[in-house]
A protein has these predicted regions:
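Short, Lys/Arg-enriched N-terminal segments with co-localized hydrophobic residues
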Residues: 39-58
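Short alpha-helical segments that sit at the start of domains
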Residues: 65-92
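Short amphipathic alpha-helical interface segments
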Residues: 87-111
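Short amphipathic alpha-helical interaction segments
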Residues: 112-128
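A short, conserved structural fragment
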Residues: 127-138, 347-348, 377
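Short, amphipathic alpha-helical interaction segments positioned at domain boundaries
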Residues: 140-177
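Catalytic cores of enzyme domains
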Residues: 178-324
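Ferredoxin-like iron-sulfur electron-transfer modules
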Residues: 285-295, 312-341, 345-364, 378-388
Length: 390
């Protein structure tokens, strides 16, 4: 793995509302991080995975990594197998294969045959790499391996010193295989795992704004918070939207800080990050349940891995909010700002040069409202409280 980023002197003027001034150099290339919500440029990656030509011996070396890919529902994906191979040694792969169902150190030692000292070293390494997690109950710690592709994606690509080869493999996977994976697992999902949560700007009279509809209420009710970089933008590099904007909540914040992939933030800083993201036109995405206690993602249109499944027709992956945008046509100036900001092609200008919303396409994010110069757009409640599961 490359060494940790080297601090450099950045060009003047690279500051923002959140503060900080950093610049990083990584390998032969160079990218800059704009303060505490950084930006990185796009770059080209291979359009396909180069096939190994080393014969049967090299192919057999991939076998435990293929088994791990199969275990997280990505059987047949050589890219996911390569990601496991890049990150985990053969001994570490052995521990991962033994860590399902969740197991104590003693159980892992029995399954793998590793001595306690070596096993502890492997566990620490796997934890730092984002491949192994733990839970504690009644004073007993149990370790479990990464459970699915999105978790593998977020946990392995979040570190600032993630190897470039890893990021390129992830970009190749999300560009080529990810929508099909989402289609395959959709049939087994009891409910959509994530949903859009609206910005807090303007709601029509009579609309009920409940705590789980309000991203600021999520922040206010959090025990603790941390911020990490957006793995999707770190991988795809297709835009210059803010980078350090994924807000981890409660246990996810504990994990990010313990691992060193995130930094603790105050509620005020979290709210400032959200405000900046709304100005930038990013969509808030959270867990699809009433108690949001994991993460608040702030997603762009071009890099985020949440949108390709939606475009591919996967209905039970990400759900809209309980609201739909409505336009007061008497106030609309026909400037077209909302059509440019909408991710979902849900707004168009009519022949009379006023905006019209397609409710079947609208995800109820409210991004269109933030920059409306005449305040012609508001959100209307169209789905009941029961739309959001417990």
């Amino acid at each position: 793995m490359p060494s940790k980023p080297i601090k450099q002197t950045c060009a003047p003027g690279w500051k923002n509302a959140v503060g900080g001034l950093r610049c990083h150099q990584w390998g032969k290339g160079e990218w800059k991080v704009r303060g505490r919500i950084g930006r990185i440029p796009p770059r080209e990656v291979p359009q396909r995975l180069e096939q190994d030509s080393g014969g049967g011996e090299e192919m057999s070396q991939l076998d435990p990594y293929r088994e791990l890919a199969e275990a997280i529902g990505a059987g047949g994906s050589e890219i996911i197998a390569k990601i496991f191979q890049l990150l985990a040694t053969e001994d570490e792969a052995k521990v991962l294969l033994a860590a399902s169902p969740p197991a104590t150190m003693e159980q892992l030692a029995q399954k793998t045959g590793f001595a306690e000292e070596k096993l502890l070293e492997l566990i620490r390494s796997l934890f730092q790499k984002g491949l192994l997690f733990y839970s504690e109950k009644a004073g007993v710690r149990r370790y479990y391996r990464v459970r699915h592709v999105p978790q593998l994606h977020d946990a392995t690509a979040v570190a600032e010193d993630a190897p470039r080869e890893l990021l390129d493999l992830w970009r190749l996977y999300t560009d080529t295989e990810w929508p099909n994976y989402a289609k395959k697992v959709e049939a087994f999902l009891p409910q959509a795992p994530i949903r859009v949560i609206p910005v807090n700007v303007s709601f029509q009279g009579g609309s009920r704004i409940l705590a789980f509809d309000d991203v600021r209420s999520v922040v206010d009710g959090a025990r603790n918070l941390a911020v990490t970089r957006c793995t999707c933008r770190a991988i795809a590099r297709r835009c210059d939207k803010p980078l350090e904007v994924c807000i981890q909540v409660n246990r996810a914040a504990d994990y990010a800080v313990e691992r060193g992939t995130g930094r603790p933030i105050s509620k005020d800083e979290a709210l400032e990050i959200l405000r900046r993201c709304e100005e930038e036109g990013l969509v808030h995405v959270v867990d699809n349940r009433k108690e949001v206690d994991h993460v608040i993602c702030n997603c762009c249109k071009c890099c985020c891995m949440n949108w390709p499944p939606l475009k591919a027709g996967v209905k039970r992956f990400i759900l809209p909010s309980r609201f739909v945008a409505r336009v007061d046509q008497s106030l609309c100036s026909g400037c077209g700002t909302c059509t440019q900001r909408c991710f979902f092609d849900a707004i168009e200008l009519t022949d009379g040069e006023v905006a019209k919303v397609d409710p079947d396409k609208c995800m109820g994010c409210g991004v269109c409202m933030v920059k409306c110069p005449t305040e012609a757009i508001s959100l209307e409640e169209v789905r009941s409280e029961d739309f959001i599961p417990q």
